Amino acid sequence: MTLQTEMEAALEVAALNREMLIILDFGSQYSELIARRIRETQVYSEVLSYRTTADQIRQLSPKGIILSGGPNSVYDDYAPVCDPEIWNLGIPVLGVCYGMQLMVQQLGGQVDRAERGEYGKAALVIDDPTDLLTNVEPGSTMWMSHGDSVKTMPEGFELLAHTDNTPCAAIADHQRKFYGVQFHPEVVHSVHGMALIRNFVYHICDCEPTWTTETFVEEAIREIRARVGDKRVLLALSGGVDSSTLAFLLHRAIGDQLTCMFIDQGFMRKGEPERLMEVFNEKFKIHVEYIQARDRFLQRLEGITDPEEKRKRIGHEFIRVFEEESRRLGPFDYLAQGTLYPDVIESADTNVDPKTGERVAVKIKSHHNVGGLPKDLQFKLVEPLRRLFKDEVRQVGRSLGLPEEIVKRHPFPGPGLAIRILGEVTAEKLNILRDADLIVRQEVNRQGYYDEFWQAFAVLLPVKSVGVMGDKRTYAYPVVLRFVSSEDGMTADWSRAPYDLLETISNRIVNEVKGVNRVVYDITSKPPGTIEWE
């Protein structure tokens, strides 16, 4: 997404007369998290490039501006800077980490290398408990990640808080409503970080909590009807929370003008294709075209062991099937995609190479592998969820009546079980893994742990091990259990699952799944590992 289209998207929101805050992104890994935290206060927020000008910001009429952190130092030759006219807009500004340092430098203060960098948790000593720090307890733990610090505050600024290593941990110009914090209130490690964010949103920016699931659904339905009119829309349905929520939303907006296509490539978990058709076709009367393509996909993977080659072949075959079936079922004017706001942020290329100052483009993942369709099948896009984060999609799904089993569904990779079978994928291995995975899901649910894990699944290894069953030697496959805890999937810890749960799962798998004689538990976090094995 270019800066121009990024602005166009933001102007669409501004045209709705919705209160919003904007985050100017200087390349921080936490910019998206800041936006999510503001949304949690029921106030809309958008992440924009730091290159957004003061005039462009004025067009958006935001209630407040947040300057994100970033990997640079403000005195680097290629350090990203915001338009200095921002300080003359009369809009409250909160600078976070690098954003605070940039504020200080542009307003006449001094930033320099800290005598000692501060990384991790630090206790906040509060010097002025009013305004920004209301309800933030003295000694609160805040998350630090900086090697520079403010040496001299600009004229008009006062000290709000410090830590043992950071003399200026929070500062303010109360008259102009400019605030800066050296720590990251948006991360979960900052104990009272949300209290600070709420103070800025409600008390300093004077926002009202108007960003709700109900208002989004109403606006989205109006937008869909206005855009689509009486034309037909095609949606590739996977059964995940994103495409399912999108299907429910589109069906409520345009009814039978929507056609859902479910391509069963043979790599879903046991019972999922049947359950999907039951939920959509039978229970909710949302028409789904079921495309049975299992043999085609399995043939394409014959003899293939490289994980990237498996992904490519699955993607290419998906496009071929989608092309054939959309021609058969069409014509369609629109293709609905479940693009989410993180995808929009990723494509905005706001990262900066500190050595060259060049923009670092970020490749956006293709959605459902429909990005390579031929030109005569280039549909117009409908992307009603493009302003939502994943947790907001779940809330919308619930409000639309989506079954809880889909709303709370653990993330499942597009290539499905094909990348949870290491090495070549065969019909025999798929059956083994489906049976093992079903036991994992059954026991995790039965014992009440499903919501405790980000993901909990089984992996089939391409080796065999010796075992003994009924006084006889066995030589069969080992299954790996992979349970992880995470907030967003970007990082993850291996879950300390109860031994009783693991024992029950292990006993059931070796006794009930033919071809398996050993179960092991993966205790690798991400990083250095990844959540999926392939």
UniProtKB/Swiss-Prot annotation:
It holds the Pfam family GATase. It comes from Synechococcus sp. (strain ATCC 27144 / PCC 6301 / SAUG 1402/1) (Anacystis nidulans). Residues 211-409 form the GMPS ATP-PPase domain. The active site is at C97, H184, E186. This is GMP synthase [glutamine-hydrolyzing]. It catalyses: XMP + L-glutamine + ATP + H2O = GMP + L-glutamate + AMP + diphosphate + 2 H(+). GO terms for molecular function: ATP binding; GMP synthase activity. SUPFAM superfamilies: Adenine nucleotide alpha hydrolases-like, Class I glutamine amidotransferase-like, GMP synthetase C-terminal dimerisation domain.
